[in-house]
Design a protein with these regions (language model features):
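Short, basic amphipathic alpha-helical segments that act as recognition/interaction helices
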Residues: 37-60
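Short Lys/Arg-rich basic patches
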Residues: 1-29, 33-36
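Class I S-adenosyl-L-methionine
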Residues: 129-135, 153-330
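Bulky hydrophobic/aromatic "packing anchor" residues in well-ordered structure
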Residues: 24, 217, 262, 352-353, ...
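Short acidic, glycine/proline-rich loop/turn micro-motifs
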Residues: 35, 152-156, 389
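C-terminal target-recognition/interaction regions appended to catalytic cores
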Residues: 282-428
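Core alpha/beta nucleotide-donor-binding catalytic domains of modification enzymes
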Residues: 61-177, 187-191, 196-198
Length: 428
């Protein structure tokens, strides 16, 4: 073959929709030509090249595989929605809140839901039976056991049964052997009972063959317009290494603000609004574009009509301040530190909670709507919440921000695909 001559298709391979070209030096080509029928160096070279390409193809295939996910204590399914958005196949959500499960099923593709009391470990049999009947091999188990028992925010007792609800996840992991387990909770868990609570979780998973490590993630660093910290325990089955948590994607000066997140939504000052609404304007920021990507109508954006007294009090609170900014005749009525807190338009919001009476819109004299709270939690607008307003606020506040789940899910794929790197790949 002449130098520079055209070889049809030589060194090219289509991989995941892209064309890759490998340069093969003429000396190697000559060796291949001279020994084409032998079993000498040409076979080794051809084999190495083909093996490399097939390994890359296999890697792409495994990266794009829809790993199965089971969500325990799912609530509305914020954590598993993040996994779904990262290309995973969410197959089942389990919780005891019937309306939250209705929301879960409506927003997780073909996933089903199951109402079970997970404090009763006998109910785990139903989960196992459901998966076995459908020949579903579980890849990933995720869950956020109720945090009230662990949280530093409320009364805690060592014998609070909610402190042990995480053991349902241990039992499911022991029975179904998922490749990875992600357990989410409040950061205070790491300090609870002088760290003994967290240590027990680690030991329980280690005893059934998992390498487990906790880490606190700060939501604004991952593109979520909300000051929220959560601890994640990530356990890898029969792994020699700990999970490396994803690196932050934003610096403080880049954090998404309240205004970035919700300024395109109807004002609803003094009115309730409709169940289904049109957007009043195009997206104003990249974050709004992302939230509206798959939505053409607006849901869960119903306002609240406050009393004249409440509106008067709210109107006197500047951006980013709370009741302490009021004249003493009013401020003395409040004791709770976050009472009458107004969001700041140029900062992320405070932590969204299950209540909805303490925080107020940065501009309008009302509490945020369910949709505004959902935006601040990184729920996209096509994620529709069911139930009455109180139930919807609870679902939003209890959830893990989907975007946090998304970043963990992408990072986890690096570990799930490693299982295949030592497999024998046939080539000819």
């Amino acid at each position: 073959m002449k130098r520079g001559g055209k070889r049809e298709g030589a060194g090219r391979k289509q991989i995941h929709g892209k064309e890759y070209r490998i340069k093969i030096e003429d000396e190697i080509i000559n060796l291949l030509n001279a020994n084409f029928h032998g079993t000498t160096i040409n076979d080794k070279i051809r084999g190495s090249i083909t093996l490399g390409l097939e390994t890359l193809l296999q890697s792409n295939k495994e990266w794009n595989k829809q790993y199965t996910v089971l969500d325990l204590f799912s609530g509305a399914g914020g954590l598993s929605r993040g996994f779904m958005d990262a290309g995973y196949n969410v197959v089942l959500g389990v919780d005891f809140d019937e309306m939250a499960l209705k929301t879960f099923e409506a927003n997780h593709g073909s996933a089903k839901s199951m109402k079970l009391d997970l404090f009763d470990h006998e109910n785990i049999n139903q989960i196992e039976q459901y998966l076995n009947e459908r020949n579903i091999e579980l890849d990933v188990l995720v869950g956020g056991p109720p945090c009230q028992g662990f949280s530093l925010a409320g009364p805690r007792e060592a014998n609070d049964e909610r402190n042990t609800l995480y053991t349902a996840m241990v039992k499911v992991a022991e029975r179904l052997k998922p490749k990875a387990v992600i357990l989410e909770n409040v950061p205070g868990l790491l300090k609870l009972y002088e760290g003994k609570g967290a240590q027990r979780i680690v030991e329980d998973f280690e005893n059934i063959g998992y390498k487990i490590k906790p880490e606190i993630l700060y939501a604004p660093e991952f593109g979520i317009p909300q000051i929220r910290k959560r601890v994640f325990f990530v356990a890898l089955l029969e792994s020699e290494e700990y999970f490396k948590f994803p690196d932050p994607v934003l610096f403080p000066h880049e954090f998404i603000t309240c205004e970035d997140a919700i300024s395109d939504l109807p004002a609803l000052e003094g009115i309730l609004g409709e169940e289904i609404q049109e957007y009043p304007m195009p997206p104003q920021t990249p974050y709004q574009e992302l939230m509206r990507k798959n939505a053409d109508k607006l849901y869960n954006h119903i306002g609240t009509i406050h009393s004249e007294k409440t509106v008067k009090l709210i109107s006197m609170v500047p951006e980013g301040k709370n009741f302490k900014a009021l004249p003493e005749e009013y401020s003395s009525q409040f004791k709770y530190n976050e009472a009458l807190t107004r969001y700041h338009s140029k900062k992320p919001s405070l932590t969204i909670n299950t209540g909805h009476r303490s925080h107020f819109h940065y501009e309008h004299n009302r509490i945020p709507t369910v949709r505004e709270s959902a935006r601040l939690q990184s729920f996209p607008d096509d994620f529709i919440f069911y139930g009455n307003k109180t139930q919807q606020y609870k679902q939003v506040g209890n959830a893990v921000p989907p975007m946090l789940g998304y970043h963990i899910a992408l990072q986890l794929k690096n570990y799930l695909t490693k299982e295949h790197k030592h497999e024998t790949i046939q080539y000819s």
